[in-house]
Amino acid sequence: MNLSRILYPALLLLIALPVAAEDRPFIDEMHPDVNVPDQQPWKEGAINLPPFPQEGDLVEFEVDGAPGQFRYFIDGKNLAIGDDKVVRYTLVIRSDSGANNISFEGMRCDSWEHKVYAYDNGRGEFRRVASPEWERTPKHVQGPHYELHTFYLCIP
């Protein structure tokens, strides 16, 4: 009888040891899958400034909740998706008085980011931004970048 008190726990321990030595997939680090190629980090392509937009090429779009004194356009002739998957476009914001704010921009649909590459220099030409940076596009703030991302340029 004393022997069975010692034998059963010892047998259970011997059975449990190989199970405990197995790989713990949610605890141990995963081994890379050799069948999946390594993903290269994203790299932005070269930027060429487009020609300055012409009035006849502007396509108006609506921005819900925006003040009524502005109208929004993109240059339909120079809208492109690069090999780097960045949508590049010229944005024109026009006030009721006729003043234009013109910028050449890029939008990364997958990461909800946008970047301004150049602005109107006041002489009908683009002036490059010295060090353009990607900015997060707010997902719940009505504005031209949200509208372009959600309803026009990044539709899945």
Model-derived segments and spans:
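N-terminal secretory-pathway/extracellular module detecting exported/lumenal segments
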Residues: 22-156
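Short N-terminal alpha-helical targeting/association segments
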Residues: 14-15, 143
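C-terminal active-site/capping subdomain that shapes the small-molecule cofactor and substrate pocket
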Residues: 11
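Bacterial N-terminal signal peptides that target proteins for export
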Residues: 1-8
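N-terminal signal peptide c-region/cleavage motif recognized by signal peptidases
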Residues: 16-20
